Amino acid sequence: MPPKKGGDGIKPPPIIGRFGTSLKIGIVGLPNVGKSTFFNVLTNSQASAENFPFCTIDPNESRVPVPDERFDSLCQYHKPASKIPAFLNVVDIAGLVKGAHNGQGLGNAFLSHISACDGIFHLTRAFEDDDITHVEGSVDPIRDIEIIHEELQLKDEEMIGPIIDKLEKVAVRGGDKKLKPEYDIMCKVKSWVIDQKKPVRFYHDWNDKEIEVLNKHLFLTSKPMVYLVNLSEKDYIRKKNKWLIKIKEWVDKYDPGALVIPFSGALELKLQELSAEERQKYLEANMTQSALPKIIKAGFAALQLEYFFTAGPEEVRAWTIRKGTKAPQAAGKIHTDFEKGFIMAEVMKYEDFKEEGSENAVKAAGKYRQQGRNYIVEDGDIIFFKFNTPQQPKKK
């Protein structure tokens, strides 16, 4: 049976941002809002978490496994010798302060660290604690969110001027017709960011050519955000805090579609110090759960990443790809020969595998698909690739 032409004619929307799968999400916020504590509990590491601004100077970076019941289930079924989940690369960036775009605090260095990331965990503080100073003198997460947004916005505005000046010199005054379209696009970006004071990512109708230009410059306001609200343990457990509704309203108005996830750094730290059995008892007694799995998954999705599985008795592995990746390019993640000699992808949906109970049962039910080179891989696909081995050049 020839492979089906799954995905023919379906073109995924272009993505603003760096191309690739080794993408990073940075933890961004004002000093002393709980960034390093969050990084530590997320990664089980011991980054400095002292109570003073700029205790994090060089960014700390770590890989965090992405929790997935599908992966766990496949491992339980196959009992493989090797288990490799997907990972999220997380960076702890020092606290920004008002005036960072002008070099206040360690502003320029911090903004360059954000520039090196592909998405942002925007962490804000909504807990009171007299022992933990706030750089602005009081707890007001809306004000804090606006400070961060303004600093990123002002840095982009600062970047746009010289880019347009350079293009104008070559494309307009110099008559370089090839660069004229890029100049026109940057004028549109200027109108949106500088004149209308809106982040790059808020405009949802950038076309392919415009996104190509945006991706040359990687503006800070083009990066997707997940808003993390750090609560006291008490507020998190009772699911009440005076700021939560206000934060959600602000995000819905100024960053529509972005997620707002409450968590408690204090609770997560406490859970980390308990044994697995004690942790389970504590969570059940308080009728709550850790927010970390939800946060990790949200960060991974914000970077437009997903993964497919290869599964067998030797190895169960999650292979990270960008959304919209076609089967040959997904095969190339395993080995370049798989892409070069691609014949077809034999695909099972995880849900079908779970429902039927085995690969043979999936085949018997007619749910095992052969897909061609235009098939767009979907998150959670279980795939076996068929390919021709490239011919080795004959020795003379």
Curated annotation (Swiss-Prot):
Q: Where in the cell is it found?
A: Cytoplasm; Nucleus; Nucleus, Nucleolus
Q: Which PROSITE patterns match?
A: G_OBG, TGS
Q: Report the residue ranges that make up the OBG-type G domain in this protein.
A: 23-283
This protein's cofactor list reads:
Mg(2+)
- In this chain, where does the modification N6-acetyllysine occur? K294
InterPro entries assigned to the protein according to its UniProt record, in alphabetical order: ATPase_YchF/OLA1 (IPR004396), Beta-grasp_dom_sf (IPR012675), G_OBG (IPR031167), GTP-bd (IPR006073), P-loop_NTPase (IPR027417), TGS (IPR004095), TGS-like (IPR012676), TGS-like_dom_sf (IPR023192)
Main location as per UniProt: cytoplasm
Motif window: Nuclear export signal: 267-274
Binding-site residues, ATP:
N32, V33, G34, K35, S36, T37, L231
- Gene Ontology CC, one term: cytoplasm
Q: Transmembrane helix: is it a keyword of this entry? A: no
Domain of life the protein comes from: Eukaryota
Which terms are listed as keywords in the entry? Answer: Acetylation, ATP-binding, Cytoplasm, Hydrolase, Magnesium, Metal-binding, Nucleotide-binding, Nucleus
According to the UniProt entry, its GO molecular function terms are: ATP binding; ATP hydrolysis activity; GTP binding; metal ion binding; ribosomal large subunit binding
UniProt keyword Metal-binding present? yes
Q: Where in the numbering of this chain does the TGS domain appear? A: 304-387
Q: Which sites bind Mg(2+)?
A: S36, T56
Query: In which family does this protein belong, per the annotation?
Result: Belongs to the TRAFAC class OBG-HflX-like GTPase superfamily. OBG GTPase family. YchF/OLA1 subfamily.
Per UniProt, subunit arrangement is:
Monomer.
**Entry function:** Hydrolyzes ATP, and can also hydrolyze GTP with lower efficiency. Has lower affinity for GTP.
Q: What is this protein called?
A: Obg-like ATPase 1
Q: Which gene encodes it?
A: OLA1
